[in-house]
């Protein structure tokens, strides 16, 4: 009995902290004209992104990403989990060890922590939402899975 009471009292502050934290979160409703697209470090020049929610340098975030025709982010991984949902155009996603999948508007992809994958805009420009559950980063790899500098990975790609 005393154990249950102690446990309940120990968890009580968490309930209030969670509720208080949720109250601090403000809703967001906006059109794309309100966001500013810019180049992100270590990504191909053909990719721009706008922050929809959060701060990609410090924690979870949602980005709206645009890529030009044939634009490709070569084999890479991220330290956080990543979710992608196509808005427009066609994107080709290939997860290491899987067959490539062509995504159209509404298509979805999920890459768990450090899962190597590649993305290419096919047949024209494309746009997609990218959700990261931690600070956004990108680590490129060679054909053997060894990490390589962004400059090396992007040197032979469409910029």
Q: At which residue positions do the language-model features occur?
A:
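Conserved short histidine dyad/triad with adjacent acidic residue
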Residues: 58-78, 112-114
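Bacterial N-terminal signal peptides
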Residues: 6-15
